Amino acid sequence: MLATLKSEESSGQLQLVEREDIDDDEDLFEAIDKLIAQGINAGDVKKLQDAGIYTCNGLMMHTKKNLTGIKGLSEAKVDKICEAAEKLVNFGYITGSDALLKRKSVIRITTGSQALDELLGGGVETSAITEAFGEFRSGKTQLAHTLCVSTQLPTNMRGGNGKVAYIDTEGTFRPDRIVPIAERFGMDPGAVLDNIIYARAYTYEHQYNLLLGLAAKMSEEPFRLLIVDSVIALFRVDFSGRGELADRQQKLAQMLSRLIKIAEEFNVAVYMTNQVISDPGGGVFVTDPKKPAGGHVLAHAATVRLMFRKGKGEQRICKVFDAPNLPEAEAVFQITAGGIADAKD
């Protein structure tokens, strides 16, 4: 059961603007068991589910090499399964008009700050990866906690009307932090916490396996947000030195590919935080230049890249570093007891 708004008026500063509601009942994916009606053996469908494939959309995102690696699925069976899936989902060409129509299923989740929402074109977008990088205490994790709550708001209040999955690689998730944020939005804290599933990852392999296990949950329940805080930390620990850099980047690319597929398969917003490293080529006019960790592999995976930095007091500054549909601009926001909010003069 999703969290409900309290009857009393919210004490938050956010101006909630109503918008045309989205049909939450509309199927955004085809369940894998629909293959049975297409003549696929129920036992083979079960093998796909055991391998973490729960939708026909997700099936078509796997290579035949990966599928034939599933125990009990021969090349002939895989060909038949893929042929059946192609009848249920269209992974071919569509017109630009159809692509525009498909974009209408995208939800933009409020950050809690009107200025930050406007910078992002309405909020954090589903079916996309939003990366926030910056130094410690720049507001990345605070935004993650605020999104845990705002995602559960109704869509006509700029929420996602869905649940949240949180993968924590640095031990920074604080459930007690959720309570005042939920109260600020006029929501029941207990219900909000019940709609967040949380896992602490300790190795990069553990982090990847946690992602694999999400498909089963997301195919059954309405999730709208996946948080990975932070995406790079365990890779920097588990791989050391230039000798392991190529292997690290390959494993990182595999994990990022999985994040992209989750975002598009289930129409969820993926919000991941990233660390920064020194940039020797940053220029002589910049004091202590920094750049996001992860290299080109991470840069190409993120749909929207945001650079966070500290302002005066509790104020923080967010800059659009890279995005396909947003201009390079900045917004000032503030960290409050109730989460991310507009900055006070």
UniProtKB/Swiss-Prot annotation:
Gene3D superfamilies tied to this protein: 5' to 3' exonuclease, C-terminal subdomain (1.10.150.20), P-loop containing nucleotide triphosphate hydrolases (3.40.50.300)
One family name in Pfam for this protein: Rad51
InterPro entries recorded: AAA+_ATPase, Dmc1, DNA_recomb/repair_Rad51_C, DNA_recomb/repair_RecA-like, DNA_repair_Rad51/TF_NusA_a-hlx, P-loop_NTPase, RecA_ATP-bd, RecA_monomer-monomer_interface
Subcellular location: Nucleus
Keywords tagged on the record: ATP-binding, Cell cycle, DNA-binding, Meiosis, Nucleotide-binding, Nucleus
UniProt: dsDNA binding residues: R236, R242, R248
Positions contributing to ssDNA binding: R236, F239, R242, R248, R316
Gene Ontology BP term (one): DNA recombinase assembly
Protein origin, superkingdom: Eukaryota
Binding site for ATP: G134, E135, F136, R137, S138, G139, K140, T141
GO MF term (any one): ATP binding
Subunit record text: Double stacked ring-shaped homooctamer.
NCBIfam families named among the record's database cross-references: PRK04301.1, recomb_DMC1
Family statement: Belongs to the RecA family. DMC1 subfamily.
Function: May participate in meiotic recombination.
UniProt protein name: Meiotic recombination protein DMC1 homolog
Protein's organism: Glycine max
